[in-house]
Amino acid sequence: MQRIRDDARPESIEVRGARVHSLKNVDVDVPLGELVGVAGVSGSGKSSLALGVLYAEGSRRYLEALSTYTRRRLTQASRAQVDEVLHVPAALALHQRPAVPGIRSTFGTMTELLNSLRLLFSRLASHVCPHCGTRNEPTLNVAAGLPIVCANCGKDFHAPGAESLAFNSAGACPACAGTGIVREVNRAALVPDESKSIDEGAVLPWGSLMWDLMKQVAGAMGVRTDVPFKDLTPKERDIVFNGPAVKKHILYKPKKGDDFAELDFTYFNAVYTVENALAKAKDEKGLKRVARFLEEKTCPDCGGTRLSEAARAPRVRGLNLAEASAMTLDAAVDWVRSVPGSLGADMRPMATNICESFLDVARRLLELGLGYLALDRAGATLSTGERQRVQLARAVRNRTTGVLYVLDEPSIGLHPANVDGLLGVMRDLVADGNSVVVVDHDVRVLKACDHLIEMGPVAGAEGGHVIAQGTVGDVAANPRSRIAPFLADGESVRERGCMPVSHMFDLGHIRMTTSQLHTVKPLDVDIPRGRLVAVTGVSGSGKTTMVLESLIPALKARSAGEKPPEHVRALDADGIERANLIDATPIGANVRSTVATYADIHDDLRRAFARSDEAKAGGWKAGDFSYNTGRLRCPTCDGTGSISLDVQFLPDVDIECPDCRGSRYAPEADAIHRTTKDGRELTLPQLMAMSVDQALAVTGDMRKVHARLTTLHDLGLGYLTLGEPTPALSGGEAQRLKLASEMGRAQSHAVFVFDEPTIGLHPLDVRVLLGVFDRLVASGATVVVIEHDLDVIANADWVIDMGPGGGESGGRIVAAGTPEQIAADANSITGRYLR
């Protein structure tokens, strides 16, 4: 029943017959003007409803109102598979994995804080006279567009405007074009193996970037090409690397054929060959060919600041723009607050306005826990969670109204201490007259919602239904709800048994001593072997530096007999032979990688079907059953299961292949059956369409396949279909799938490191994950988890808490001990939330 306000405006978005991905003809009303949470186990259809229906339809309908000319220049969402969606506002989505920004992007540009800072330095700085070099006091003339009269020489000059201080514009360093780095040819990479002769390919660029006949041109230049490169004279080596571009007459014989050709050819030395290829590179592929011959260095002219000398000249309170940009946001806020008071009375009103614009933007970012980031930090180095929070802060700053914001797990990478800031941002969006739909698993976020929609009851084919809906109280009281026990605080946090402190280090230690790196102070780390160890702390406290930049590289270097990173001063890890990083990066680069291929069962399935009577009668071999290269792959989609349609004026549309219906196989494959133990006859396309759990029931006679499927089931991945493309898996699913090959082996010599493995996991899925950790620990492994999730932290044997804050105020081990000891430690911010 549609709810109508007194003024006859609709109160909810009405969704009818939604069938996107796993949704089962869903009918649901989503309240407008409220904070609506979408909950459910992983793979239950949450994102399909929020992003695949609400955002897709909201953005598509808005874009359809624009002109054709404009639409052609925008990325458009395809029409959602839904019967009807009524009253959906224009929609914006804040995705779980925002795009990684380019080389010209910094934290300051992404947040637009740098705009305010540039204006501050243009209007409020002391400027240098270009005629005599005298520094002149700040003046209102700059804001009025009037020239400054130099106090020393009396000549007029104009101060630089804000645009003249931008490293993406007029303020760019001319040497590096505003990137802060320069690319130089790495001569060591040009000839990596000096035992080879030039004829044998010693000079790599001539083989990969230039015509092969350059070897003969070098010979004509007086260089011996048939002796090892190390035996060349200094003069010959100089010709190879720096020789002049002169024409030489050569007799060229192609590799194939006996004909000779006389050619006049200009000599390209090895260095120029690379420089020429770099200048001509027009795309990523071209740059990739050249990249291995280049090395990136900090620009010597600007020192990596990206700014020209003129842009670095204005000063405010003794700092130039580059120095102010190098400060963390926390430090920059304190500095900006002090600027108006440092100026004359006539300048203060304008200074206050400019500084307030900076501080208003900064306030949101500080609430979201990003105060430790420096303004000049490269955007590409920000974590997924950091980029998402920048995106969120920018959205709330725009003060729009009547917009539908769809947030996909905004609590990713967020320490419990920063959740209140996130909730404040979402509340402000609603207060401005917007609607917010948030997909999340964090119980604190869900409890703060005005309305909850829970999808389920399980993942995959059996999910896709709305199982509970209403206020938090309504859902908590619903017997069908699977999130209800966690909303009601009735669930026990502790799933694993407690390890007595007296026995914590019975299996040994991993000890590491480091010197300072980034903002992390010198550390002495002691990790108990054969235990589950959680590394915690607020964002920017040094968790990644300690584990991913120190512990993992040091362990891997030790195993390989190589030198550890310079900042790792000592490592005691006797008996550790393997260090495995299990992260959430997507598996595979394209749709040809599936669960079956990654789990290494597809080859066994192909061989099994090739042994069937029908396959033998048709002359089909195991290789023919490959959907990538085999004769039985669908000729229409070439084994991908989908085709892309080029629609003029509209975005390309990927649709299920009309011939194979997504199975990836030609019709001939449907005629080849294999009989299971229970007498069922199945084709390979039918088996690939089954979930892991369904396939388990019909592969009992295939020992290796059955064992690997059992492992996937035990990892909580029983709902995935065998033919599911691996790049489409969530971060948590990808992590567990990567573990499949490690389960069931003795692991006493191994360390497993997980980087926020609870991303995308429902509290029930977290329990499954804890079971996986338990199995690894039981097999002897040392498991180190970088984590914010309180349930995982509470179930760890040992906790190392970094902090106390982020950036310069962090970088130390605040506390180490059992979860109970951390909870009792007054210095631990994490401990407050464990009590």
Map each language-model feature to its residues.
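Conserved phosphate-binding elements of NTP-dependent enzyme cores
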Residues: 1-835
